[in-house]
Amino acid sequence: MDDKKNEDVEMRNFNGRSSPSQRDPFISKPGAAKRGGSSFDLSNVTNSPGISILAYCLASISMTVTNKYCVSGSNWNLNFFYLAIQSVVCIIAIIICKQAGLITNLAPFDTKKAKTWFPISLLLVGMIYTSTKALQFLSVPVYTIFKNLTIIVIAYGEVLWFGGSVTPSALFSFGLMVLSSVVAAWADIQHALYGGGATQTKEAADALSTLNAGYAWMGMNVFCTAAYVLSMRKVIKKMNFKDWDTMFYNNLLTIPVLFVCSFVFENWSSENLTKNFPLETRNNLILGMIYSGLATIFISYCSAWCIRVTSSTTYSMVGALNKLPIAVSGLVFFAAPVTFGSVSAIFIGFVSGIVYAWAKVRQNQSKGSVLPTTQPVMSASSQSNRDAAKA
């Protein structure tokens, strides 16, 4: 998911906090490994910034590639079922890790918290479903580029509801994100219409129809993702969730919703199941579905690991830089069209991610260096929320 959809997966699993108390029970602390007489010291690996960054990048790329592989079959139409299997595998993995003592800060299931969190889970279903549909119709590079538009919607949502602000450098990065999306769409449409050197044909019309469906799903995903992130931010402060609690409730509460949606809206006839799971690729597809569930754990682990041994600043820059290999993976593994337009769009999107990460770093540094002697400017709705909280 996802991102994949790796961005979707991170938002699905983690609440964005990175306090050591929430990460350390799962990731070894520096010096925690035993220093015996053996030549190999595990702490050299667990405390290596380079290895943690590489692991995070590989986990993100593998998640995106796996999701694209699973949903890109010519007859695939069981997206709800696929996402349900992901959540089931993730929950099983969390329970096993807890029983093995790898996760020690997962609180027992609370029915009251589940009821409060359930609306957020419904928004999550909308986010991950539209994400897989967009990935099904669009190439990985185009999907990755358009995913940046979510950042813009979330940023202005924070301005409206949480009193956030948009700096000039962030605004410049938003312009680059929009430009990269326009260039990517133009390159995609040009390749669909004239990629074979011919003029408009039935095949070109079908390809254009597929792209239009992908853009429609991508647009819905942008707003579903923003709604999920902003709503989660508003509710999570009341829940006192730790990172693994967020992952557990998100995946557990979506399981019944996804299965019900699958049984109601998807075709479960034997003929359709055979089309979705053809004999020649059935085993690989099942393995991919299982791995995609485990990959949500891997990405969450690698995210916390990367933040622990580097810094949140480095992690944000790695996330921006990671856009490039994810987009390139689509060119390598799925034969996405390599044209001047597509390469230019990838490059512009890559630069926009770096500029945005740099803008956020500067904004955070300026906040930390200025004493809060005045009341910050905020929107009316944000002020009313703050006044209500004080009441």
Curated annotation (Swiss-Prot):
InterPro entries: TPT_transporter. Residues 1-44, 97-115, 165-170, 231-245, 306-313, 360-391 are cytoplasmic. It is a multi-pass membrane protein. Its main location: Golgi. It comes from the Eukaryota. Glycans are attached at residues 267, 272. It comes from Sclerotinia sclerotiorum (strain ATCC 18683 / 1980 / Ss-1). GO terms for molecular function: antiporter activity; GDP-mannose transmembrane transporter activity. Keywords: Cytoplasmic vesicle, Endoplasmic reticulum, Glycoprotein, Golgi apparatus, Membrane, Sugar transport, Transmembrane, Transmembrane helix, Transport. Residues 66-75, 139-141, 194-209, 267-284, 337-339 are lumenal. GO terms for biological process: GDP-mannose transmembrane transport. Involved in the import of GDP-mannose from the cytoplasm into the Golgi lumen. Belongs to the TPT transporter family. SLC35D subfamily. GO terms for cellular component: cytoplasmic vesicle membrane; endoplasmic reticulum membrane; Golgi apparatus; Golgi membrane. Disulfide bonds: none annotated. Residues 1-28, 369-391 are annotated as: Disordered. Homooligomer. It is found in: Golgi apparatus membrane; Cytoplasmic vesicle membrane; Endoplasmic reticulum membrane. Residues 1-11 have a biased composition (Basic and acidic residues). The chain crosses the membrane at residues 45-65, 76-96, 116-138, 142-164, 171-193, 210-230, 246-266, 285-305, 314-336, 340-359. This is GDP-mannose transporter. SUPFAM superfamilies: Multidrug resistance efflux transporter EmrE.
